[in-house]
Amino acid sequence: MRKLNHSYYFTQRCAGGVVAFTIAHLLNCGVGLSQQALTSATITMSTGTESLAPAVTMPINTEGLSATTISLVTPPSVPAPGFGAPQWLVDAARADKFVEIPGKPLRASPLAEAQRTQSPLMSAPHAFQPTGSFSGKVVFAMAGHGWTYNDDKQIYYTQRALGHGIVEDFGNLDQMHIFAHLLWNSGATVVPLRPVDHQPNERILDNTSAQVKFYGEWQESSSKVYFGGKRDRVPYAFATAQRSETAVARYRPWIPESGDYPVYVWARDGEDRVSAQLYRIAHAGAVTEIHVNHRRVGKGWVWLGSFWFEKGDTGYVDVSNVVDDPYEDDGKHVVVADAVRFGNGVGDVPRPAGRSGFIREDEADCYWIERSLGPTADRRIYSSNVSDGNATIASPPRTAAYMNRETEGSFTDRVLVSFHSNAFRGQSRGCVALFNESPEQRPDYQELLARMIGTQVNQELIEDPPFSYPKWAARDRVTYNGITFGELRKDYIQNEMCATIVEVAFHDNAEDAMFLLDPRARMDMARATLRGVLNWFAALRAKNSALGVLPTAPENPVARSLPDGRIQVSWQPGHAGRIEGDPATDYRIYRSATGYSFDGGQSTQGELAAVLDPVTSSSPTYVRVTGLNAGGESWPSQVVSVLPALAGDGATTVPMRRALLIAGITNLDATSDESQVIDNPFGNPADHGQITWRVRPRTHLNAPRMQAAAEALTSCAVSFDSCNSRSVGEGQIRLNDYPLVIWSVGRQNPRNGILTTPTQALIADYLRQGGKLVLNGAHLAAAMDGASPQSVPSNEDRLFLRQLLGLAYRGMNVQSRVVSPVPGGVLQNVPEFTLTGNEQGLGDPLPSDVVGALGGSGEVLRYKVAGASAAAVAGGSTNRRTGNWMFLAFPFENAGDEITRAELMRSVLEYLR
């Protein structure tokens, strides 16, 4: 094989000057060389004085190339005016040199009043958006399709039909949500072109709303671009930036229901904006500080993150005029206070057949954008003369160009990533990233971006630890450009940034569908996309070559109470490597009194353990841990909880019992998916009333599983420590140190490392030593005594369930959510209750196991359905009033409400006394 050592020198004039390319080891350079002449090319780019990127040696894929073609990375060329776009779009997208002119002073209260009415959490350590590899970057995140209005049929429809439990319109959104949170944790400013997270409530506060108060010195703007109504007297307010705070605008909504709320802000961009406008979100648990560069992005909703707010008006968002940069304290730079949004709401854009009424995030992008851009934006940005279906294609890139202020920063400081899934007769598999067929309609470096993401996703899914289904399919071709895609058109996006569509898998293929329904795979796809974008940044700019990836979440947290009432928390590092992420260099531990809202956190200085004071002495303390590195901050670990022995007057009062809470859910898998029934045709009327599955790992992680058992034990005056099942199996904590163990596996199939043979041996020894055990879960009995393609129990599994515990699997309950006590049984005082929880992120409790008692065991709860239908079995003693164990064939956290669970726990503990 020949090796060429020639260099070819090219120059091309672009907006930034003359850029020179030195290309060595060049394949297919148009001189009749064989495609087999070389296997790699080394590319160096410079301006003559500054290296734009380090020399990169890239493998050359000759598939489909003629002997005289090669795709080279070239700098942005001088564009033709508007790239052929209509003049209205060119004008709408063009960055202007807008600056505020002195305006009428706004009526405002003294700044001291803002301090007097601020959240008490202002005095506690604040939380911050992490800094990381995407700090300073603006990412426009998109998810294809969604509920769309059909003018001819006058109905709303999904653009893709149901198949294998998946509707692409919703799966794309779930994928974007995961990606958005990874971006936020990596320091990015995220502009979602469909809403982030699931929150049907909404509160939108404009600067003129009664719930908005101004403090200090503000002025009225005369801008013609703003959020609100066409007749608003004051478009918005602005204040001069200063090193010390002299102006605050406070947006205090009435939150109708406690929950996790995405928070968005709307501010016009401009030349005189500060580079880091400060927003303080006072939510339950902490005050979080976020900075947005409104010289770079504006005129639409920018996502600040998602935060837990309690019902009422205790939470708020402040806009502050304080800046760190002394250059911006010059009397010329300003901060802007226009609108703040809490939650997503439901569809309310009018159409001839009415408003959709669907959860707004499930609608197509054009409706969110229409409600986002303000009264003076050109409606052609989000509409189409043809149909709403057409509008969903053009809206995202046009909106990105409209919101982006391209004169601030460089081409690589922003990017648009859109998520879809693919279909091709059920036969194709794998990830494909897209770029446009027409070279004239490709934003600069688009093919490179597509190739890097497509390669990364496929490679990581192949190499990731095996899932419980067929392996990821290796693809020869990881990109596709068979047509010119509207979402990616250069004229729509005005070449202000690069853009690609990531078709993460083929939803019409049964094997790929298994990946799409698995949150672990969805997380891998999002993380691989993140790394692919970073690779693209690094290929184009030398300063980006060292960018890292945020770590994975810490594993196996354990919370123990110490004799002096303090709390010891320990954990293990998350997996690190090219696939998972870079190693953590520090950890941050967060505490909560509720398990929902956490404080600002504290660094452990790299240690894998910490000792904390309890939040209160009479209620549980909840803890979670994150890992940090130069790439950002990981997702949080599992939540663990502890209730120390209660402290009295200088002496320790020991509660009547001590327990260990074990979270058996250690893996994200398809059992954590949420079912969704839509009483409306999807893309196909035959799908009416069918179930689609939503993959929402963040909702799953935040679900109140640990809280349910912790609150019930607290009501029974039982102190406890907690961990997950892997911590037990790996010897981090001993069962025999606790007289009572409550082991919960939720809806997860416990075959994947939860009740392994060694763990079963530990439980058997614990019971022989006189320990008391409560096992609960929807599929635990089926996994250990049933027979299905997904779960084939071993002989050890069956012996454990049948001989040690004295019960057997009898079938599956798919009908009844009502559970009743067996008359005369040990739980006869428990009131009849209903299995609930799907709306809380706990997942649908059905189907759940039906069990039967063996030997000296006895049935104590039954599903309210005809036939043999035991929902709980108790046993372990010849005394029918006391025993060693209780088995609940449903998740404890799904048992009715808080009062019901407290009564159920009290009766169970009475039996296990």
Descriptions of predicted regions:
Residues 247-271:
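A short beta-strand element within beta-rich, extracytoplasmic domains
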Residues 129, 135-143, 147-203, 207-218, ...:
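Catalytic-core regions of hydrolytic enzymes
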Residues 235-239, 320-334, 339-348, 407, ...:
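Active-site-adjacent mobile loop/cap segments within catalytic or ligand-binding domains
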Residues 538-581, 632-655:
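Pro/Thr/Ser/Gly-rich low-complexity, intrinsically disordered linker/stalk tracts
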Residues 648-652, 656-665, 675-683, 734-792, ...:
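Short alpha-beta junction capping motif
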Residues 747-844, 856-858, 864-866, 904:
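A glycine-rich, often tryptophan-bearing local segment used as a flexible ligand/cofactor-contacting loop or short
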Residues 181, 186, 194, 352, ...:
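Aromatic-Pro/Gly-enriched surface loop or interdomain linker
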Residues 612-634:
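Beta-strand-rich modules
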